[in-house]
């Protein structure tokens, strides 16, 4: 898939679903791909691929499962492949907003991993730049984008920091997008910011991202 990226500016909400339908059956572990919890039968989205001590993990939302749950990915032919087991899950919610919502799935077969965003800029795959923290996001107030298996790509203006440190921004998201990557973009570079956690039911374009910089730093994880 060659999904050409166009910079989105202003206060408008951008949404593109059709071009990202391949995320439903990607046959590989890539940001935004659908991952099915084999115990629950429900699905979320791959966030970022991280590494620690030579092992690779999917960083996704904690509410997508519990420790010990297996997750699978479907290929274009409809075959399901178990890709790993959740080794860490924490979810603390406050109404519609998760105070803390992070999970790690240990990847069984690193050969299935394509850690790059499936976006292209001027016919070159978009470069994943350095992870940025909440202070950077507050200073630059960039437009944020999220990818997920349910609704594809959506971008909108950054709104602010929630009471418990979550990042609030405007975009379109539905159940199934949870856990997917959230990033800022500039000139063909994507700056990882967080993962999709949820949204406000009474104000559906307000979305919630869990910041990831401190989690990665504290845990000794490196983004691939």
Where does each model-flagged region fall?
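Poly-acidic low-complexity segments
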Residues: 4, 99, 109, 192, ...
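Serine endopeptidase catalytic core focused on the charge-relay Asp
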Residues: 29-163, 184
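Active-site donor-binding loop signature of nucleotide-sugar glycosyltransferases
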Residues: 107, 197-198
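Hydrophobic alpha-helical segments and their boundary regions
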Residues: 130, 168-169
């Amino acid at each position: 898939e060659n999904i050409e990226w166009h910079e989105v500016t202003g206060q408008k909400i951008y949404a593109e679903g059709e071009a990202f339908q391949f995320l439903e059956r990607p046959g590989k572990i890539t940001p935004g791909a659908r991952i099915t919890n084999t115990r629950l039968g429900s699905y979320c989205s791959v966030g970022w691929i991280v590494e620690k001590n030579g092992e690779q993990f999917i960083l996704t939302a904690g509410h997508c499962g519990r420790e010990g749950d297996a997750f699978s990915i479907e290929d274009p032919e409809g075959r399901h492949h178990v890709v790993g087991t959740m080794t860490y899950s924490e979810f603390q919610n406050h109404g519609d907003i998760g105070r803390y919502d992070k999970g790690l799935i240990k990847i069984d077969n690193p050969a299935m991993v394509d850690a790059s965003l499936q976006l292209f800029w001027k016919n070159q795959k978009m470069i994943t730049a350095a992870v940025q923290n909440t202070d950077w996001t507050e200073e630059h107030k960039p437009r944020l984008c999220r990818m997920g298996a349910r609704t594809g790509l959506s971008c909108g203006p950054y709104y602010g920091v929630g009471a418990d440190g979550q990042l609030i921004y405007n975009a379109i998201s539905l159940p199934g997008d949870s856990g997917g990557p959230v990033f800022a973009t500039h000139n063909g570079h994507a700056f990882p910011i967080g993962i999709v956690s949820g949204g406000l039911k009474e104000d559906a374009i307000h979305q919630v991202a869990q910041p990831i910089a401190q989690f990665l730093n504290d845990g000794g994880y490196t983004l691939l």
